[in-house]
Amino acid sequence: MANAGFSAPVEYFGQGSSTVIGLKSSTESRDYAVKVTATDARGDIVARDLAGVRISPSAVYNVKAGGDLYLELGSVNTVDTDVVVLLGCDIRTSAASAPEVTLSGESIQTDGTASSTVELPAIALSPRHKAQILAGAFTLAGAGCNLTSCSLSARANITRATKSGDTVAHDVSGTEIVVSGTVQQTGATAPTIEAADGWELTTPKSKANPDEGYIEWTFEATKAAASTEPV
């Protein structure tokens, strides 16, 4: 029996021309912004109203070539009738696994344009299936100490002015970039992990001693990213 073929993912975040990442899949996540109910004396629901349809899309990308990824949280892209603002970026790399980038956002007012934006630092990515130090957030040293996973998460906070569930204005602020890593120790000495300039080890290295396994160290480095108002 013939099928309809594979689905075509939707490019919500304007990365179609990127030479570094390529769209793999997307999710729309459509829902109502307002869901209200009224109850009787017993607390049973007797009325319901819904308003303000929004989408909270996300998209997964493969890393198709080496290079720097440049992202601007708060940037806006129009898809059909939906105006989508980019709010989040998550990158996962690990030993013997393909690196993945996930972008996420929310729809805003019809005909909306970018308000404040947050420019993330350049993120160097390799298509190799290995753990990668992301955004140059830290340095690692130590004989027999190997990075086995590294992830990056950056998310901007969106605030809205609304009327009857519909957004009439929005703004973006409050972004932190968090890079987390796991290091496996096979030598006698613990790894040396230091935050790069502009970064801070907000979760110091902490070890786990598994049964029938090597010592593993986990940590997090964080950097604040300021928002810029439109001119």
Task: Describe each PLM feature range.
Residues 1-231:
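Signature of extracytoplasmic/envelope-associated structural regions
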